[in-house]
């Protein structure tokens, strides 16, 4: 699905994910877990469509609100990483900001993934859902 968006294989997708996460000091496992949770393991099926390259539901608030659109996988993952960094830290971004919702985040309020509950998503247990996915990696 992403051959024309810069990631013809899942290996390419993961390499881009790791590169973007490491550049901003965000744990790649968190980015991956969130992308898998938000997209149903890249099957999508909710408001966000695969071609949007929006792997974290940025701006998708339900009721048909599709959210942000990124021109390629790298920019979509960069926006996700930047949004996670906004929640987790007050440090400046390394790369130019591509996250359209970056300025709406109270910086540094969720330095741990569990703190994303009730912030990134309405569910109070959202961060714990991410933690469960991360724990399954080992």
Specify the residue positions occupied by each region the protein language model found:
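Catalytic cores of secreted/periplasmic lytic hydrolases that degrade extracellular macromolecules
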Residues: 1-138
């Amino acid at each position: 699905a992403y051959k024309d968006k810069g990631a013809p294989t899942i290996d390419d997708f993961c390499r881009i994910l790791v590169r973007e996460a490491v550049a901003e000091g965000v744990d790649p496992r968190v980015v991956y877990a969130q992308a898998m949770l938000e997209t149903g393991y890249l099957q999508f099926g909710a408001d966000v469509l695969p071609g949007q390259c929006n792997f974290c539901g940025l701006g998708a608030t339900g009721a048909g609100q599709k959210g942000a659109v990124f021109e390629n996988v790298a920019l979509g993952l960069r926006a996700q990483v930047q949004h996670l960094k906004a929640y987790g830290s007050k440090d400046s971004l390394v790369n130019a900001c591509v996250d359209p919702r970056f300025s709406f985040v109270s910086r540094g309020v969720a330095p741990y993934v569990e703190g994303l509950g009730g912030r990134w998503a309405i569910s109070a247990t959202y961060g714990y859902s991410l933690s469960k996915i991360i724990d399954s990696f080992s």
